[in-house]
């Protein structure tokens, strides 16, 4: 979703997705997530889950976490990496720039119903757009 919104906005950037845990590595997104994403014009069925790696902190300028627990987990990983050049990625909450959600956690929809997936898609769209707008005006 973020990748597509950035492309539409004309921003040339690398966007990727990874989890802090290892329980979904190699799997496609949940079929409910695929269905709701498709209804919003996003094709996510070819995505494959991977786990965050130490290399990500050098490959990316910014790593966004969906919730406070993942942000803490990412900070722990970052703290374990030798940062001799001061160039490790910055960390932030995904909704940090979004005036609608103001740093709230993006809820995990997997234990919920269809409405939970719809809510998450809408939050991701809103927060991605907020980040894009913040970069365009910076």
Residue positions per predicted region:
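Conserved active-site segments centered on acidic
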Residues: 1-59, 133-138
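Phosphate-binding/catalytic loops
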Residues: 62, 68-138
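Small/polar loops that bind or transfer phosphate-bearing groups
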Residues: 17, 65-66
């Amino acid at each position: 979703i973020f990748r597509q919104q950035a492309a539409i906005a004309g921003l040339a950037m690398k966007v990727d997705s990874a989890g802090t845990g290892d329980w979904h590595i190699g799997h496609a997104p949940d079929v409910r997530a695929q269905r709701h994403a498709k209804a919003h014009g996003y094709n996510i069925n070819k995505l494959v889950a991977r786990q965050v790696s130490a290399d990500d902190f050098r490959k990316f300028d910014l790593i966004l976490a969906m919730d406070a627990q993942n942000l803490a987990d990412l900070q722990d990983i970052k703290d374990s990496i030798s940062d001799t050049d001061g160039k490790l990625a910055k960390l932030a909450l995904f909704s940090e720039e979004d005036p609608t959600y103001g740093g709230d956690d993006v809820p995990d929809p997997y234990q919920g119903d269809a409405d939970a997936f719809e809510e998450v898609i809408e939050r991701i769209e809103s927060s991605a757009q907020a980040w894009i707008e913040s970069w365009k005006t910076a």
